[in-house]
Each structure stands twice: as C-alpha cells, then as structure tokens.
C-alpha cells in the first residue's frame, strides 16, 4: 500500500470573476511525500512562479504581505528558482494549471500501485486531490484523526525538530516549510496510527479517561456552555466537547463520543 502526503504553500486570496467570489491558492511550493509501510520515504518537491495577475494582487495586497512575512517567506516578485515551473499570467488559468501539474505527478507516482492512501491536513489540498479521482485511491484528512497542528507537535516533541529538515527557501525549522511539515506529520503518523482496511486508524481514548478529561476541562475553563442548564445549549455543549478533544490532539471515536453525550443527557 502506498501512502502519499501532500502539502502546498503559496498565496491564498479571493478571486472575483463572473462566477462570483472564490478562494484560490496560487502555489509557490508543493511537496508530495510518499512511502510504503516499513520503507523509507521519497520526496517530490515542485516550485512555481508567476500566476498572480495585477487584479488578484491588488485585491489581496494586505493578505499576501502577511502570508509572505509570517507564514512561508516567499515573495510575489522573487527570482524563479532553478527548475521552477512558470504559471500562466492569468490567475484563474494559473490555478487550473498548477492543479493539473500536481495531478500529473500524482498519477506517475501512484500508477503501479493497487492500493493508495492520499493524505492531507486540511487546506485546499483536500479539495484538489478529491477532485482528481486517482484510480485505486482513498483520500483521508489527518484532522479527522485529531492530528495536532505542526506547531503543537514541535512544541511537544523536540526530537521532531532535531530530526526533521526543511528546504533552503525557508528559515530553517520554519513550521511552514512543506518538507519540514510533511516530515513532522510523517513521524506522527508512524507513531500514532495503524492501517485498517485501507485507511489510517488511531486508538481511541477509553471512555473513563475521556470523561475525566472533559470534567477537568469543565473545571479549568471559565467560559463554557455547561454553565447554562438548558436544552437549547445541547448542541453547543456537543461542539464544545469535540473542540476540547481536537484542540488537545486527543482522538475519541464516535461510539465513545455518544456515550459521553448520553452521560450529560445531550440528546
């Protein structure tokens, strides 16, 4: 079984056209990180330049400045890297072109495998790879397994930083370098998940420990919906419980979640 982890970095912004408004990502870097169980990983790294027309840049000027400075450190007008892929001048055409390029590389990587698991952690990558309809492939979002953010993982696991690596285009150790991010997530996958029927699974926190955790959070957090004893608050209470588990990277399966809801009469 081939596992493929995909991360794309670039400039995300609003595009206005005859179809209305849509959020699109024009990549500057894409990483495809792939491996088979108990084998070493392989990395495909792609760089892009161009693809941001004047209107798209002007509309999203402040957002792009923030993304460049605080997230990925790419600039709109930097010199193309060697082997960097030139995107069309028109932003919408560039968006479609980069998706097509990533799709073509995925087909090459996966074509000889009968079972493929395409992994992503939120972001537009999930929409892209679902739309690709790669043969024999299942798409899975790591967020569904309560995978912590890379920022939280590197704070908890110092060895993740020391044994992971980024690329020269980023400040070394930057959490937003796609190679660094994929390497950290790969380590988390190896340590916390197992494969069952073609997808990743994670051991759920037992019911007793899950209840103790929620009781602890209720006592520790000042602003929570359990302060109001009203049926109208039930959905908010359910959402709050789920949020507590997700924010702390704790996976609880649906059966245990339902038992917790029953305990608090959240019908």
Swiss-Prot record:
Gene Ontology biological-process entries: symbiont-mediated suppression of host cytoplasmic pattern recognition receptor signaling pathway via inhibition of RIG-I activity
Keywords, comma-separated and alphabetical: Early protein, Host-virus interaction, Inhibition of host innate immune response by virus, Inhibition of host RIG-I by virus, Inhibition of host RLR pathway by virus, Viral immunoevasion
Domain of life assignment: Viruses
Induction text: Expressed in the early phase of the viral replicative cycle.
Similarity annotation: Belongs to the asfivirus I267L family.
Name this polypeptide is given: Protein I267L
Organism of origin: African swine fever virus (isolate Pig/Kenya/KEN-50/1950) (ASFV)
